[in-house]
Amino acid sequence: MHRVRGDHQSTGRSGRTVTTRTVKRPATVEGGVGDSPTRPDGVTKLCGRFEYAQDLTAEGMLWGATTRSPHPHARIISIDVAPALTIGGVHAVLTADDVPGRAVFGLEHADQPVLASEVVNYWGEPVAVVAAEDEDTARRAAAAVAVEYEPMEPLVDPLEADTRDEVFRRMRIRRGDQNARGDVVVEGYYEVGMQDQAPLGTEAGLAVPDGHGGVDLYATSQFIHVDQEQVVASLGLRSDQVRAHPTGIGGAFGAREDVNLHIHLCMLALHTGQPVKMVYDRSESFTGHVHRHPARMWYRHEADHHGKLKRVEARVVIDGGAYASTTAAVLANACYFAVGPYRVDSVAVDGAGTRTNNPPCGAMRGFGAVQVCVGYEAQMDKLAAMLGIDPLEMRRRNALETGDPLPTTGQIIETPLPVIDVIDSLAAMPLPDIDDRATLPGGSGLTTDRAHVRRGVGYAIGIKNLGFSEGFDDFAQARVRLEDGGAVVETAAIEVGQGLVTVLAQIARTALGVSKATVRHVDTSQIDSAGSTSASRQTQISGGATLEAATRLRERILEHYEGDDLTDDGVMRDRGLLVPMAALATEGWEETATFRHPPTTGPDEEGQGTVHADFAMAGHRAVVDVDPELGLVSVVRIDTAQDVGRALNPDSIRGQIEGGILQGVGLAVMEEIISEGGVIKNPNFTDYLLPTILDAPDVEALLIEQDGSWGPFGAKGVGEPPTISSTSAVVAAIRDATGRDLSRVPVRPQDIAL
């Protein structure tokens, strides 16, 4: 437990006091675009005083808990809540019959039951929820709910699901002459395991009834407006009766995009008339959020004798698990980027997002682009080896450039795409010369013999869209006002650790001309949506709204007072003070703006169209040491060059790069959810292996800046590219060290040693 210095109390519409930590999320940012100011939430996080959703309490608060299915697929015969209600301190036990509104929810398609009523479709599916006076009692009561099941045979093989037409979406992309052929052909089958986002903070929230039939919801989220819409529908209330508030979040990476405990909390709070809090434990968290889709892929690449690609065929099957979540969009992304950042005129891609009784899968950093990168980059290495061409030169000869069509959709790439610059930058970076016992596979324990260790070097280049696609109306609203001698940015954009609280303040400071700015997160009743903190979009979209609002505000103030500059002192004219800042702050100057990215379209029947608003890419070089006798791998260093548009905050970008690379390393050599018959066998951080700081390689990062993006000051989103090709680079390096044709990630010791 972190030491709490005291309590901050606020009274909501219900009249109840919500108690949080004394030191609330942040403070003022000094420094403008291009600087790397200290994060306003950095010290509180470092000292353990940051306010997370788990820290919220309220007067008269109850605790919630969930009864979950022990079967991946079963018919519900009966539910008896009486045993739970006999436990002292239990205030409510709710089932599907108690859902007052729409019985299902879903981020893109409402198909998931709020509480299962007739059938359970995955292991851990919620069947009932309980409210009690303390957490232990709530969990005991949830375990006491007597549910009679009739187990059924689960469908767990995505390829079988595909043949049965159990799919959420199919994709078909055809571009160019389908009879085109090359001089050389390589084929391959590839598989990617199920990865967890593994945020350190589990799902948590607090719902407080307002006494008038409505509720205030404080819960972990990446998209509070869409969460609110789903809660409203299932509660059968008006939109203004549910207010979703941003909270402190201990990591997300896609795990917070889908609703989980949100509706349950509100149902319990409204039923009991008391605030209700829920916090998932780690095992529950593995069933309470979606995961990265496992994928199976077949590729066929054809090229001429000079290494120029002539045709690419691919078949991509991803397992969506029991419910839709974002499977349709992830599949589309995987297919749109199935060729990578390479020029080719003949393409055929087919894809399926299957429905099984495996755990639901959805958004995770990279959103489909990670999986296909494993396939197409292995294919590029195979072609290079067959033709005797250097792997980087093979990629350079086929690199996309601005003005080229995307090889799958035919969309013309209008914004900067420095693929060749990235490749050349990687080639120019010096290789490490490291011979340190501590870096050997097995570490300083000397479980390996240096004589057996082989060094390998591998390369990979990845590409992905920025923002939402396929005609989605992607927008964000922001409000900028003058207050307390500086700028205040109000937004519903969620800070999940990526540094948005710093960047939005930097944008406002630069646009207004003041030296201090604060970001204030507000609830759904106070501002329109900022969209999801996903798709590497917030810097561009919410940043664009902030820039537009701040620019308008500055222009209005200067026009009103006929000034020629705005500074910390106030409105200036001919270098003299015209109106003091203190006076401006009391006059309520503010401006609200809504920013949209360039319009996109859905694909036609051949998969063609202007599907994306922008693109970003990165390249990685991995250096590994491998002991092929023990199957141990040490990732020594990762070099990377990344397309960032304009670097608004270089240190923050480097932080994103290092974190994203470590997730990529995890997928390459250790991270995988093991599901047997639909049951997760490793739902904890003891058995689900994660890279620690001891596994973190040295990282050398080069930020490639180019003008031309429509983001604020030319910025691009930077969160996802570090993850897309880092996995593939590590696997390529292991192939180089061992000579093995590794086609599955994560690469396990038995894949190397046996």
Task: Tell where the protein language model's regions lie, with residue ranges.
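C-terminal catalytic domains of large/alpha subunits in multi-subunit enzymes
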Residues: 96-97, 236-243, 271-276, 305, ...
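Conserved beta-alpha junction segments in alpha/beta enzyme cores
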Residues: 182-235, 332-335, 457-486, 491, ...
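Thiamine diphosphate
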Residues: 250-273, 277-279, 500-507
